[in-house]
C-alpha cells in the first residue's frame, strides 16, 4: 500500500545517505561507554577494535564515510589519544589516514560539561606530510581563552604551543600515544629499545572485593595481631597473624612512606578467597602470588599530579591502587633515582597524560645506561635514608619511636625549654629537607643531560615537590599535645621507644618517669573542677616538668599556648581551651577519620567531654567513666552553682554581678546537659558492650554507643 511504500522510500533514502561517500564529514559524536545489550552486541560485532566508547566507533565509521582525500572533523574526549583501550583505534588511524590537525583543549575548557576535549581533523589519505597540533592544556579560563590562543597561533605559527610532527613518530613510542609534543631526544631513547621491563617486573595489586571488611589502618587493630618482617607466604601462614602490612597508594611522596594499612591475610587469605558475602560488589582477585612480601618499588596508580615512587622493604602485600615492581638489589637504587626524576614524569606525560600510571606503562619507560651510575646510587641511597628517617617522626606510623622535640632532652638533663627543643628540631628538619632537595636536583640534572632534555626541563625543584616536611610551629606543637595524650593513656612511654601499649597485656614496668592514667579516661573541662590529677592541666604540668624540668615550666606553658593560638586569660587557660575545643578535630585529621581516642560529648554546652583510648576499652569502661568521673563532675557543677549564687547575693558592683550571673547560668546549662547525658550513658553502661578490634573503628565506634549518640561523630 501507499504507506508501506513511503516507509520503504524513507529507509532507502537513509541507507543512501549512510552509504554515500562525502568530501567532508563533521560531528560531535555521542560519548557513551555503558551501552545497552542490543547496542553493545552490535558494536562488538561490527566495530570490535573500536568499541571502548561510542565516540570511538564514530571516529572510525566517519572517516570511512569520506572520499579519498576527504576530511572528517570531530570533537571528542581526548582519552583516545593515550589510554590502552583505544590503542587499536590509534594504530588503525596512523596506518590508514592522516591526522591533519588537532587541538587539545584545557582540561575543563568545555564549560557545558567537565570533559577533557580535543577537536581534530582526519584526512582520508596515507602520506608522510606533517600534521599541525595545538596544545592548549596550560591555558585556563574557558572557551573564550581557548579561542584566543587558536587565533594567536594562526597569526603567529611560532608560538610555543604549536607543534608540527610526522605521525610516524608516534609509532616509536610504546602504545602509540598521540604524543605530538615529544622531542626527538625522547623518541631516540625509545628507539634504543631498553625498557625497564628488561630489569624489573611490575604487577597490579590485590583487589579485596570489600575494603571495609578486609583492610584497616594499622592503628585500628591490636598491634600484636600484625605480622611484621614477613618475607614469604610460608612465614605468613605459620605466624598465625591475621593482619599484614599493605601498600595502598596514598598522597604524593617519594622514596619511602605511605605505610599506613594492613590487610586480613590470615591463613593465606582464606576468608577473602572464599568470600561469599552478598554485599561484596566485586569478588577478590590478583592475590599477589610470588610478589607478596618481597621488597621492591611501588607507586600510587591514580594520581592528581606527578608520579612518586617508593621503596618497599620485605613484609608487605600490595593493593590494586598501589602496583608493585620486583627488582634485584643491584639495580634498585639506580631505578629509584630514574623513576623519581623529572625525566620520568615528563615521559609519563607523553605516554599517558590521564595520570593513570599502570604497570605496563612503567615497564615501557626507556632506561638508558649512565656512566656515573655510582654517583646516582649515592644520591638515591641518601634520599631513601632521609625520607625513611623523616617518615618515622610521626605517630601515625608504626615505625614511630619518639617524639622529635623530645629527642635531645636527655642531653640537657631534662632541664630545657620547649622553644629551644623545637628550634633544634626545626634545624634538623630543614637540613633534611635541604639535603633531599639537593639530591633530587642533582639527579634531575644527571638524567636531563643523559636524555638530552635540556630544552624541555630544568633540574630545579619547588619546595612542594620535595616530599619531606619542614618544621611548622603550630602543627608540631599540636602533634606534641597529641603525644602527651598518648603518654597519658599509656600508648607511649617516656621510657620505652615506640608503642608501649596498643592491645595485648599491660606492662606497668614500661612506665617509670611518668605514670599513665589508671583508668581509660581523660576528662576535658573548661575549668579545673577536680583539683587533682583527674584534671588534664594537672597532668600536662606534670608531663612538662618531667620532660623539660620545673625551672622552665611557666616559660614552656607560655610558648606552647602561643603556638596553639587560642584565646584565654592565662597560658593554662589557652592550652585548656585547645584541648577542650580543638584537640579532637586535629586527632581526626592525624588518624584520617579512624581515631584511636574517642570523645564522649554531651552536646553544645560542653557539660561533659572525655577521651577514652580504643585499645584500653572493655565492657566496663562506660560504667567506670560514669560513676567515677561524670558523677564527680556533676557534684562539682552543683557546688559551683551554689558558690556563684552566694557571690551574686553579696556582689554590689553591677558589672561584676552580671558576669557572675553569666557564669552561673552557663554552669547550670552544663549541669542540665550532663544530667540528660548521664541517663544515656547509664543505658549504654548497663549493656557492658564488648568490641572486637578486628572490626575496625567505624564499626566499633558505632557499636559502643548502641542506639544513642554518646561520641563525637567521625567526620
Which residues does each PLM region occupy?
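Class I S-adenosyl-L-methionine-dependent methyltransferase module
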Residues: 1-20, 24
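Short coil/turn segments at secondary-structure boundaries
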Residues: 3-4, 200-213, 229-230, 258-262, ...
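Generic recognition of flexible, low-complexity loop/linker segments
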Residues: 10-16, 61-62, 105-109, 230-235, ...
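Signature of N6-adenine DNA methyltransferases within the class I
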Residues: 16-234, 258, 268, 274-279, ...
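Proline-centric
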Residues: 32, 62-67, 322-332, 345-392, ...
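Contiguous C-terminal substrate-recognition/catalytic subdomains in enzyme active sites
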Residues: 233-290, 298
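Short Ser/Thr-interspersed hydrophobic loop/turn segments at strand-loop and sheet-helix junctions
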Residues: 290-308, 318, 335-349, 584, ...
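Terminal accessory regions of large proteins
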Residues: 404, 410-413, 420, 427-438, ...
